[in-house]
């Protein structure tokens, strides 16, 4: 962990700061503007959120500069058996504090805690080149595919204990709130923040 940073559980008093941080971290990265901060905001009271794993990073001045957000999710087999797993994301680091190991520290410490809490595995989508260092591999290696049955390198799984994912196979279902975003509510929510220009940039996904 980088010297000068401290890590602790997120508290309700941090919500406004972590949502603003998420907006700063994701603005114009994957699309013009972003919706990750709204997703975090809209899920605060959702039973799928795992508050025990949601951590923040503070700089030497006590300003929150990093945040990781966990939710329960599930893998459903063809015979209908449901296997509970977990996921993290968004994981946010303020642009001024990136490349200092904050994201890595948040991932490592929370995954260790998740293992102690006896969760079987973590399922995410992301950049394989980045996440392989934490033990993630192609989810298809565990017989896990996307909700639509597809398989792709960005869909990854990490076992949180030896053989814990052995019985898990089927289609992965993330929280529907991550996809079902009301654009009008997003615009109303985003209006409370300082204006930032939405730009279409090379490399964006949408």
Predicted features and spans:
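Active-site rim helix/loop that mediates acceptor-substrate recognition in acyltransferases
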Residues: 19, 26-60, 64-69, 74
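Internal, conserved structured core segments that host functional sites
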Residues: 52-53, 57, 89-92, 119, ...
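Conserved active-site alpha-helix within GNAT-family acetyltransferase domains
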Residues: 116-119, 126-150
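Acidic/histidine-enriched, glycine/proline-rich intrinsically disordered or flexible terminal extensions
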Residues: 162-206
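A conserved beta-turn-beta hairpin within the catalytic core of GNAT-like acetyltransferases
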Residues: 73-88, 98
């Amino acid at each position: 962990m980088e010297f000068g940073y401290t890590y602790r559980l997120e508290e309700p008093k941090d919500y406004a700061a972590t949502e603003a941080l998420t907006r700063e971290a994701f603005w114009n990265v994957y699309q013009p503007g972003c919706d990750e901060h709204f997703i975090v905001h809209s899920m605060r009271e959702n039973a799928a959120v795992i508050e025990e794993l949601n951590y923040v990073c503070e700089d030497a001045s006590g300003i929150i500069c990093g945040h990781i957000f966990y939710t329960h999710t599930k893998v459903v087999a063809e015979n209908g058996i449901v296997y509970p797993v977990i996921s993290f994301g968004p994981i946010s680091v303020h642009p001024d504090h990136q490349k200092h190991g904050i994201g890595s520290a948040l991932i490592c410490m929370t995954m260790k805690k998740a293992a102690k809490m006896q969760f079987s595995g973590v399922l995410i989508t992301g950049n394989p080149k980045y996440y392989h260092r934490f033990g993630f591999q192609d989810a298809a290696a565990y017989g896990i595919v996307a909700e639509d049955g597809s398989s792709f390198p960005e869909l990854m799984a990490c076992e949180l204990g030896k053989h814990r994912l052995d019985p898990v196979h089927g289609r992965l279902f993330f929280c529907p709130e991550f996809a079902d975003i009301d654009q009008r509510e997003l615009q109303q929510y985003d209006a409370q923040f300082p204006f930032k220009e939405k730009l279409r940039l090379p490399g964006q996904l949408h």
